[in-house]
Regions:
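C-terminal motif of bacterial Sec signal peptides marking the signal peptidase cleavage site
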Residues: 21-23
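Periplasmic polypeptide-binding modules associated with outer-membrane biogenesis and secretion
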Residues: 3, 25-338, 369, 374
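Gram-negative/organellar outer-membrane beta-barrel architecture
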Residues: 169, 284-432
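N-terminal alpha-helical segment
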Residues: 10-13, 267
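Bacterial N-terminal signal peptides that target proteins for export
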Residues: 2-11
Length: 432
């Protein structure tokens, strides 16, 4: 009876707390003249297909989030406190609750500017964004109404690129461009294209070439609905002046060095197999990323840092610094159990690992487990289980040359063996 009484008392307490939470105002702690921002809404006039989520993140001030059916218990809890923040009880209640978001008109104006800028970035020029403020008691609901601006289709695309080998390589890459005549013009599209193109040029040997060398001109005077596009590649970045201009040139790899902790015993041949960067090769950003991925995949190093240092002579040196991780360790686990028949069980487990057992990134895993069950009042009822497992993993495909595996992933050959002994009242068996 006592257990039932405690249960009903607990349920009554929870029900009372929930009722108080629902009934408590969410604006009780607001000062005179303050309002709680209850909601934001975005609507696009005349275009139901536009995804409003594209601009919702650009609203500066967000209302309190709701957890259950438009209810936030932590917001209600915060409003249980009094207005005097110096009282200990009020400070405690506020520390576990959530303060109401106080509506700020200046944030609405800033949000309108933010949304307008982002719409222009998406290619909607001359958009109109307005706000409608609805006040209900001490709460404010803000609606942002958007009339989308004009969009232009891309007409002819022309290029202005420095002459020489760079121009040949650049124009050869335009077959893979993501900006084509007939597409909608937007800064978003052009930005993505410059990132793609800059990456492609770095793969062709142009170390240090970035999207900041690009600029664009759009001509909308000759047609009301289309824009002629001029893509320019300069020899100085957007933040520089012409006197800083330098010809774009291909780089060759110079010295390639690999360093790691001196106390780590390791076969350098394994590292050379993992590294796809070689002195005299043309610089290729893909190979840098591949080397980083392959060295990280060894799981021997907590840090892999690839540093590229250009020289004035068109050569870039590569310094690879490896920070070792913990090479070996133990994991111990012990579990206990009982069941309805009165059996008591103890299950110990021990695992040992070594990441560099033969000094070539070979992983060794050893596991030992047991499961012992018995009855406390009847020692004749018992069962025992013991198991051991061993695994060895090599960072190569045994029997095949490493030269045929050139991608970022590292092939592995795994050898596993296990033994399990079970002694139960019904049977005794060994499993390998």
């Amino acid at each position: 009876m006592m257990a039932k009484s405690s249960f009903f008392s607990l349920m009554a307490t929870l029900a009372t707390a929930a009722a108080l939470s629902f009934s408590c105002s969410t604006t009780r702690v607001l000062e005179e003249g303050q309002y709680r921002l209850a909601s934001n809404k975005v609507e696009v006039i005349g275009n139901s297909k536009f995804n409003t989520k594209k601009v919702e993140s650009y609203i500066k001030q967000k209302p309190n989030s709701y957890i259950i059916f438009g209810w936030n218990p932590f917001l209600n809890l915060y409003n249980w406190s009094g207005r005097n923040p110096d009282k200990a009880i009020n400070r405690f209640i506020r520390s576990i609750g959530t303060a109401p978001v106080v509506y700020q008109p200046s944030q609405v104006e800033a949000s309108i500017e933010n949304i307008n800028r982002h719409l222009e970035y998406l290619g909607y020029y001359g958009s109109d964004v307005r706000s409608d403020i609805e006040v209900k008691g001490r709460k404010v609901n803000v609606t942002y109404s958007i009339t989308l601006g004009k969009r232009f289709r891309i007409g002819d695309i022309t290029y202005s690129v420095p002459d020489g080998e760079f121009k040949e390589d650049f124009l050869a890459d335009t077959s893979a461009t993501t900006v084509r005549s007939g597409d909608y013009l937007s800064e978003d599209t052009l930005e993505k294209e410059t990132e793609r193109c800059a990456s492609a040029m770095r793969r062709k040997g142009y170390f240090g070439f970035t999207k900041n060398y690009f600029s664009f001109e759009a001509d909308t005077l000759n047609s009301p609905d289309t824009a002629g596009l001029l893509m320019m590649v300069k020899e100085y970045t957007r933040n520089q002046t012409p006197e800083y201009a330098r010809p774009h040139r291909k780089y060759t790899l110079g010295e390639v060095s690999i360093s790691y902790d001196k106390d780590l015993r390791f076969n350098d041949k394994v590292l050379r197999n993992m590294c796809t960067l070689h002195p005299g090769d043309q610089y290729d950003e893909n190979e840098v990323n591949t080397t980083y991925s392959r060295l990280s995949a060894l799981r021997m190093f907590s840090g892999v840092n690839v540093s590229l240092n250009p020289r004035d002579s068109g050569i870039v040196d590569c310094d690879i610094n490896l920070t070792r991780s913990r090479m070996q360790g133990f994991k111990v686990n012990l579990e206990g159990s009982t069941n309805s028949t009165g059996l008591i069980g103890i299950s110990p487990q021990l695992n040992y690992y070594h990441k560099n057992i033969f000094h070539g990134a070979q992983w060794l895993n050893l596991g030992f487990l047991g499961n012992f069950q018995f009855k406390y009042d009847d020692r004749s009822v018992k069962s025992n289980e013991f198991g051991v497992s061993a695994g060895l993993s090599f960072p190569e495909f045994l029997g095949l040359p490493n030269s045929i595996f050139k991608g970022p992933s590292v092939p592995r050959t795994e050898i596993n063996a296990s033994y399990n002994y079970q002694n139960r009242p019904e049977y005794t068996r060994n499993m390998i």
